[in-house]
Every structure is written in structure tokens, then in C-alpha cells.
């Protein structure tokens, strides 16, 4: 017997701390008996061939974070993910399942919500009933080439027959970097710069003399000899996130329903000057989700199931976010030396030099703002009519689905002047102060309609069963 050892590495960029108002314990779940919606049918997990992993929605329900699928990291064998920056509103991850089988750039598994391809990044975990991963060709074969890199199936919650049940959940959490890099201060930077200079040219005159190094160390004149920890000045130690959810479910023999609403707010990752503007320049965001489904039974033979999800999300960022240095804001925090220039000059002007003309205070507070908004609706209707009166086990089933989203992007930018303190006490200016303007906006609309109809037959013969 061959044994294979799979080593998985998971990189976590943030720690989250949540204090639930009311603790709830989930009942044990037999994953093999759970039903998953495949391409054209519902089937118990134990009857799905191939490499399959199952996780209940209750296991990730109380895991903080705006992207709930990130909570799957370390919980399902063979699944890994990475995030390019983790900033609020930009924390969508890329997922990878073991055994990628494509040479194209897109090697991510497809994601289906209730059997329909959709965006799961902002799906609220309280609406998730279960998640199933199909990880090999045998399991994902029915999806053809689209399933070459695996399939993530998400089943959302449905109403249950009985009295009305109302549930409300609220949480407040804080995220923080697991570890911040420790950088050289101005004094250490000067020492090592001189050492590197002498290594290259032993006869060279050091750039930083003893008096300058001592001024950096003592902090005697922070405007002439700056020692700015850009990371501590502009990157928050803790980032606040709040989430509220309410859901209502119930029903009887003729109708079963489930309705939920969720609101998520992320305060932003940077320290901004709230007195500098009347508008928000932080990388904050909020998401509002509404989800509802109804199952109607018209007599013994006709069943209708409708589902609709609506989402409204908004992301905010500095105006320079649309420019190169805006996108590389974190990189600039980590690449600007402590002694490059002070944040502000002694006269209150924004500091800068000929070598460093991207003052982080100016980028965050005086470059304008940008707003990205998306409104989306995803809906479908399933109709099933039982033909058992004529052929036992035969039914006709159909589905029609509609997806639409509208993106609206607004960018209002302005420029700011920076001033460098010269040796004679004067200032040299770089750039100009401008008024905020309408530098760009666009609107994008996407619509998709899909439908299918077919016959289905199910039957049992002795110890055999047929479902086609």
C-alpha cells in the first residue's frame, strides 16, 4: 500500500478577536448524510464519487472576517488560499485545490452557490448551510473543463416547517497584523549606509558625519534630522469591524421560507487626519446583504422554489489609489527611510525632498478620495412537476436564473505641494496645491440569464438505485 504525505502551508495575515453576545453550540453533524446540490440534482455526500470534503456552515459561523471563505483555511485538506494585501474592501482571496489540471492563468476552482455560479466573497456565513469541495476529476467530472481545478459547492440555508424562528447576531472584532517588520531607525540607517559606502569605495567620504548621526540618535532637531517610523505613524495597530445579522424562518405544508439581512462595516487600516477633510479618505468599506428563499407546494405534484440575493457594497480609498503610488501605499510605508523627511515641516507645510516626493500624510489626506460601489442581484426559480401518476419516479424539472450587477466608480483627486528644508533655512517646493476635481468616473452594467429544463428519473431496484 502506498502512503502519501501532503504538507500544507497556511499563511495568516491577521488575527481576529470576536466577543459573541450569546454563545451557541452547534449540534453534531454527520457529514456523510448531508445533501449537496450538484449540477442537476441533490445527492447525499456519501454517494458522490471521488475526493470530497464537507464542512458545516456552523463551523465558520462565528469566525470573524469580512470574507467568510477565508475561514476555510486549515479546516479542509487540500485547500489553500492567498491574499494579495488584506486591506479592508480588498481582501478577496485566490483559492487553490490540490491537483491543478490546467495550463491557463486561471487555476482557481469554480464556486457554485445552490448549484449556480456566483460570487461568494461577501456571502454571509450565517446564510451558509454547508460547503462541499470536489477535489479530483472523478468528483468534478460532471462540470467538464470548468471543473478541471476543482469545485466549491456552497449550499445556503432553507426554511423548515414549523413555528416562526427569529435569530439576531451581532459581533465586534479587531484585526491586527500578526507581526510588523522592524526597520532601522535614522541613526542605524546612517551607520549602515556609511558602512556600505565604504565597502564599495574605502576612500569615500561618509554621507553621514558623526554630528548628523548623533542628531538622529538624540532627536535634537526632528525637522532637520527626522526619525519617522512611517509604519507606526500611518498603519493602525487594530482595525475595527462590526457585523449584524437577523434571519427569520418558518412555514407550513404549503410554504416554507427563510429571510435574512446582514450589515458589515470595516473602519479602515490607516491613521488618517479626520480634521483635514469633510470626506473619508481611509480604506474603509461596508456591505449590506439581503437573502430570501421560499418553497411553495401546490398540491402533491407541483413544487416551486424561488431564491433571491441582493447585495450593496461600498469601498472607500484615498484619491491617489488610482495612481501608482496609491496602489503601492503599503510598499511606500515600508520603503521610505526614517530619515527621508519629517511628516510636516516646522511651519506646518507638508514635507518632501527631491528623492521622496510621495509624502504618506499627503497621499492619505490631501490626494482626494475614490469610491467604488456595486449593487448586485442574483435570483433563480426552480419548478418541478411530479409525473409519477403516469411513470413512477419520473418528473420534469426546470430552472431559470438571472444575475446582474452595476459598478460605479468615482475618483476625485487633487495634488499637494511638498517643501524641503534647505541648509540656509529656506524651503524648496515640489509640486503644486490644486483643488479637488472630477478626474474620473465610470459605470459598468453586467447581466446574465440562464435556464435549463429536463426530465428526471429516480428508482430503486433491489439493492440498486437509479438517478438520471
Model feature map: region roles:
Residues 166-170, 259, 306, 381, ...:
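Membrane-embedded beta-strand positions of outer-membrane beta-barrel proteins
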Residues 177-179, 223-262, 266-270, 281-358, ...:
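Flexible loop and strand-edge segments within Gram-negative outer membrane beta-barrel domains
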Residues 183-190, 275-281, 321-333, 411-423, ...:
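Flexible, surface-exposed loop regions and adjacent strand-edge segments
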